[in-house]
């Protein structure tokens, strides 16, 4: 942990804030574990200890100009819900006046995220980028998205709404969407190891992601949410490959209407595409996703691996 400040700040009066030019930390590791009783590994304070307030101390006032963390790693595991999350290669920096009760915090963040739920992998080293101005109300513990730009791998997203810390957990009221409707957005969400360079890929058609999350995140609940993923009559062609993928239709919804995680369901109303004369169609519904998933699917069509390798840059 590095601290940058003028030596004269050590001699400020009791009513003067201590001006800190910057705080930074590198190569840190945070390991958080909740056992089956919901007790965290950092909860080590003695419950029966009582502190005596003599009324003589005053809170320390800090005026921090900027802070930065580089190459941090966060591991989270909940033994009861079997949720495991790893945030790796976390780089984050922010600037703002932390002496104010309300401030605009200018932030830049990058990370790679992996997520497993009950031994099922949902995300693996997904690259996240977020440049955002957050309106912070320290008195209400409320964080509001103002100007922001996010990338999931190469999929752009914009957020609107707020997150607020409350006694029972965190209250969410967020909306998000893709700022543009290009089908290249869909290729952008695929990990770069499987999608290759997108700079010269020719695409037609649209692709949009629109959704919201609203409600309480706590030990027993998640915010209710709805995510619509839609594409109509799209196509793409990589410049170094002879074939293209055409007539792409995607109509998918990921929905939670109760706030109970296991009630989340996926409705794939339509997935279809064509490579040469090979046409593929699929429909599916997936429920009970965090326990013993129930899948109802109908698949019809032809997938010729030789044609697929001529249209999509992946070794089969």
PLM regions: where:
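Secondary-structure transition motifs
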Residues: 1-100, 159, 163-167, 171-196, ...
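Amphipathic hydrophobic-ligand
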Residues: 1-5, 80-93, 121-131, 149-161, ...
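Outer-membrane beta-barrel proteins
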Residues: 7-12, 213-218, 256-259
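Extended hydrophobic secondary-structure segments that form protein cores and membrane-embedded regions
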Residues: 21-25, 67, 226-231, 269-271
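Sequence/structural signature of outer-membrane beta-barrel proteins
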Residues: 76, 114-116, 234-237
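Transmembrane beta-strands of outer-membrane beta-barrel proteins
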Residues: 108, 146-148, 160, 175-177, ...
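Transmembrane beta-strand segments that form the barrel wall of outer-membrane beta-barrel proteins
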Residues: 142-149, 266-271
